[in-house]
Each structure stands twice: as C-alpha cells, then as structure tokens.
Amino acid sequence: MTLDQLERKRKAIIKGFDEGHSELEIRLREIGFAEGDSVETLHVGLFDKNPISVRLNGAIIALRRKDASVIKVGLLSDVENKD
C-alpha cells in the first residue's frame, strides 16, 4: 500500500519508497519521511484528490498525490487507529 491509498484519519508506518524515483525520495527524506515513522492522513483535496495533508512527526505536510504514491506504508492495527 502507498500513502496516497491511505484512508483519511488512518495511521500507518512508513515501510520504504518505490524504486526509480531517487530524486523524489531524496526530497521526501529531506522533509522528514523515513522508514519506521508514523504517518496519518488528515485531509484529501476536493479536486483530483490533491493535495493530501498528513501528520508526520508532529508536523502537518501537504503532498501532491503523485508524490505520496512513492511512499510505501503499512497500516497500524485498528486499536492504534482509534486515537
């Protein structure tokens, strides 16, 4: 699953990045995305579902949907998602 597929108000753990997007991966890492970090989708835009806003390490970050599609995530359990 990738971050752009994560439902609103769901939490996940970053598992890695799609291969073949090295420049984008570097940029995402520079703004704080890293394996093992918790991420939560807060809002999805109205038009073309852009942008996506997420909470990452206490910060709120807006991403283009195509950029979020490079970030691989794993869902946290339902208990952790009720917070």
Question: What spans do the regions from the language model cover?
Answer:
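C-terminal regulatory/oligomerization modules of transcriptional regulators
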Residues: 1-8, 81-83
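Short, surface-exposed secondary-structure edge patches
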Residues: 3, 25-32
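C-terminal structural segments of small proteins and small subunits
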Residues: 46, 50-83
